[in-house]
């Protein structure tokens, strides 16, 4: 079942100053497009997903991915760092998958001590909403299973999380093998191949069973005919 994102929210994350409600983007049914001028937060929006999924963020200055744990100070809102002694930097995503709703949040607490800004380690919070009950997922292995298999599966991430400069690396048209792999991943060809193999196997078994039953019926009919002629 596909993942359907319901909302994405930020809290004091880069230029998204303020709480989650102030920086929440509710998605509608169908394709949702995030459009903005330069330096208005599109790359930071992207970094929110990267932080959740891979604990990395894209540094536009060095034009390279950085470990998020080493970039937390830079990830914090500049306005929050100036105006608040205590604040939280976080990203929250609400999504549905196979009839179950999930809320995933990653955050770090910031504080100023003797004029020096410090922060806690980043933390993950996942809640499953099902049958009118909210169930916190506390086990780290279960959390990673939801992130890597339910939210955005690992195999789809190279195609689901793209920046412009990534397109040339995504599909190598000069390589038949690379192109085949891309098509296989996006279209689920391997799944269809598996279904075809199962269907062929079942067809062979059905044909063999039919021939066996037909042979038995033919033998029985001959026996009945001989009995009638006696």
Task: State each model region's role.
Residues 30-31, 130-133, 164-170:
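Short hinge/gating elements
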Residues 1-54, 183:
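Pre-Walker A-like glycine/lysine-rich segment at the N-terminus of P-loop NTPase domains
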Residues 29, 85-91, 119-123, 154-158, ...:
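Short glycine-/polar-rich loops that comprise or flank the Walker A/P-loop
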Residues 164-230:
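Extended, Lys/Glu-rich alpha-helical coiled-coil stalks
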Residues 40, 44, 86, 138-145, ...:
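Charged, alpha-helix-enriched surfaces in structured cytosolic catalytic cores
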Residues 35, 46-106:
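Conserved P-loop NTP-binding catalytic core
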Residues 60-70, 75-76, 101-159, 172-182:
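Glycine-rich phosphate-binding loops of NTPases
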Residues 38, 49, 53-57, 151-155, ...:
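Conserved NTP-handling cores and scaffolds of large molecular machines
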